[in-house]
Structures are given as C-alpha cells and as structure tokens.
Amino acid sequence: MKIMMILEMLFLIGMVILVVDISPYFGALGLIVVSLVGCLIILAKGNSFLSLSLLLIYLGGMMVVFSYCTALVLDLYPTVIVKEVLMKMALGVLVVVFLGYGGYLKADNGVLSMLGEGGVDNSFLGAGVLYGESWLLIVFGCLGLFLALLVILEITKSAERGAYRVI
C-alpha cells in the first residue's frame, strides 16, 4: 500500500513538472518520470507484459518528440519558471509520505491486497493480441518511429545553418 502511494506521488510530481515549465528539457524529464511511474503502477497491479511493452513504446516515442523539440528550441539556458510551486509541492508530498509511513493515513480497502501476497503476475495475457494478427502494425509503427528519429537527427545535424538554432 505504501509503495502505491509513493508511486502515485511520483506520478503527480512528474505531471506538475510537465505542466509547470515551458522548456522542452524539463518537459521531457516530466514525460519520462510520468511514463516510468505509470508503467511501475501497471506492474504493481500485476500486468508485467503490458507494463514492459508500454514502457518501450513511451520511451521510443518520447525520444523522437524530445529530439524534435530540442531542435526547435531557442533556449540556450533553460530555467524553471515556478520554483516556489515545485518546492511547496515537494514539501507537501514529503508530509503525505511521512504521514503514510507513520500509519496516520489509512487507505487500505482490499484492492491492493495482492502486493502482500506475492507481487507480480507473470502471465503473458497480452502477448497473443500484440503479436497475433497485429504484428505487421507493430513493425510499421517501429519503422515509422525509427524514420522519424532519423529525420530529426538530420535536422539537428545542420545546426550551423537554418532557423532551427540560434548561435
């Protein structure tokens, strides 16, 4: 129960990092935190295969989007816009976590009782659907992400000319 509370707080922190700042560097950090913690939450619920496949898809897609956003950014020295909001939120999260560890917050309703009984279900329930009839769609999706990454890397390679970078 305490693990899920910590994961949900980390998910909330990642969402605030994503929303508060306009710099793509911190936005990519927020997306990575949100995707990792979201996949850990799915893993804690018992779906290990779905968690792994979503993690690979999220990180592959985010690599392309982050490369494109940093190619177009004009920010040489990114700063956090709202430092006070992040500090107050971190203090609030620490208070909630310590209250939860002290036993003052009771939220056990039996939904997460599987965490105490043995952890993760290792069944491959989603493998048949992902690799059955839709294998060609997965291959084309991976090739599309790879092609987009190559295009973005070609755009960022020409940093000395064009309107993409300010030097």
Swiss-Prot record:
Compartments reported by the entry: Mitochondrion membrane
Chief site of localization: mitochondrion
GO cellular component: mitochondrial membrane
Membrane topology: Multi-pass membrane protein
Matches recorded under InterPro entries: ComplexI_Subunit6 (IPR050269), NADH_UbQ/plastoQ_OxRdtase_su6 (IPR001457)
Keywords: Electron transport, Membrane, Mitochondrion, NAD, Respiratory chain, Translocase, Transmembrane, Transmembrane helix, Transport, Ubiquinone
Known catalytic reactions: a ubiquinone + NADH + 5 H(+)(in) = a ubiquinol + NAD(+) + 4 H(+)(out)
Top-level enzyme category: translocase
Function: Core subunit of the mitochondrial membrane respiratory chain NADH dehydrogenase (Complex I) that is believed to belong to the minimal assembly required for catalysis. Complex I functions in the transfer of electrons from NADH to the respiratory chain. The immediate electron acceptor for the enzyme is believed to be ubiquinone.
Family the entry assigns: Belongs to the complex I subunit 6 family.
Protein name: NADH-ubiquinone oxidoreductase chain 6
